[in-house]
Every structure is written in structure tokens, then in C-alpha cells.
Amino acid sequence: MDRDSAQRLVALFGEEGVLALEQATVLVIGLGGVGSNCAEALARGGIGHLVLVDRDVVEPSNINRQAVAYTSTLGQDKTDVMERLVRDINPACRVDTVHSFITRDNLPELLAPYIGHLDYVVDAIDTMNQKVALARLAQDLGAEGLGFPLVSAMGGGNKLRPELLRFADITKTHTCPLCKDMRKLCRKRGVRHLEVLFSTEVPLQRVAGDASGTRSPLGTASFMPPIMGQMIAGHVICRITGVEGGRDGAPRRQRR
């Protein structure tokens, strides 16, 4: 990122912090409402290398919340749209895209080129089995000295209160239905710890389905998934720079 574009970052994180961001590699898996907005914020935050993983194309139902979704991008691969957006924001950012669906079986192979070089991984995956598989892989690689910091987004559907979002270990979560299922599956798969962003808000009740008995999809507010993505990006950036906000609002260097 050129110095003019980075001047507000330098004022907050200092030259050392901005250099750490420019040298960092962050992998974002899932470019939906959370992941696409997280990737955009990471690009604006000066991350030097982004790896973007998703297999979907932009659909009309994405427009209310996803950074990749415009009437002009309908039908296009989300990875392609996100890559163009990142390059337009920060031409100096190196972008790798992986147009693939993540499974328990292909996850090690897809991540293999980046293992040992990842400063952070953002899990914005929709499916629980893949989320836990990623957490288990991070744990197993960590035992070999090749692990990576991982933060996982929990459910933002049918929720309206971003002030109730919290970072916690999965074992300390409550209220969120996805977290309940994740805790159970983590125990089953031997995942001991997983940092997550979750909401303490009780989800709104779903609107009843039609006469055919089909359940309506989870509702999503235009602001909730993007705020979650922005919060995760902020969390990652603060961890990479070693700077956090003090109670008085002054930036403080974290102890390592």
C-alpha cells in the first residue's frame, strides 16, 4: 500500500505495525456476508497477501449483505469479484484465489502451499463439518510447529444486535444455536480450543414457510454479517500489529 493510502494506518499502528501488515499473509475461507466484508477490510487495512477461497457465484439473494454482490456482478465467481475489488483498493496486495469447495478430505491439500506462512486464517465457512475440520487441522499442525492462528465466525442469521457480538473460545459460548452444535462436534472430533466470534442475542423466530411445508431460509440483516466481517478483520489486524485499544481509547502495544 502506498504511503498516501496508508497514512491513517501509520498514524494508528506506526511504521512498524504497517510493515507487519504488509508482510502478513491472511487466508479467508468463504466469501459470503462475513468473509467478503472481512477480506475488503483486510485489504483496506494494508494486509500484503490475501488468499481467498470460495466456489460460489454471486446470486441476487447476496446483494443485501455481501461485498462482492452488485447487479453488475451477478453470475460471476465470488473469488474473481473479490480479487478485482482488493486490487482496486490496494494494488500492492498480492492476491491468490482458490475456486473450490472445502471438504475434510481436500482441506490439507488446498492449504498445503501456505502452511508455515500463514499469519492468520479466517473461517467464514457456512457448513459445520468443514469448520471443525479446519479447526482440527490447525490443532494438528500446531502440534508439529506449523500451526496458524484461526478465528471462526458463528451464526449471524436472524439477529439484529451487533453490540451483542463477542470473541471467545468455543467452550465459553452460549445462546447461539450454531455454537451449541459446534461445541458438541468439537468435542467429538477432539478440538480442544477454537476462537470464535459469536452473538449472545437470542435469534428471532423464523417466518413460517409456505403451504408446501418448506422452511424459510434464515433472515439476514444488511448490517449484521458485514459488521461481523469488519470485527474479525479488526481482530486480525490488531493481533498482527500487536496493538490494541486501551480502556481510555489510546492504542497500546500488546505484550507478546
State where each predicted segment sits:
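Short amphipathic alpha-helix with an adjacent loop that forms part of the alpha/beta core around
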Residues: 106-116
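Glycine-rich phosphate/adenylate-binding loop
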Residues: 114-119, 127-136, 140, 147-150, ...
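Conserved N-terminal Rossmann-fold NAD(P)-binding element of oxidoreductases
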Residues: 28-30, 53
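Glycine-rich phosphate-binding loop and adjoining beta1-alpha1-beta2 segment
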Residues: 47-90
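Hydrophobic/small residue at the entry helix of a nucleotide-binding pocket
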Residues: 34
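N-terminal charged helix/coil linker that caps or initiates catalytic domains
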Residues: 1-26, 60
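Conserved SAM/SAH-binding loop
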Residues: 98-107
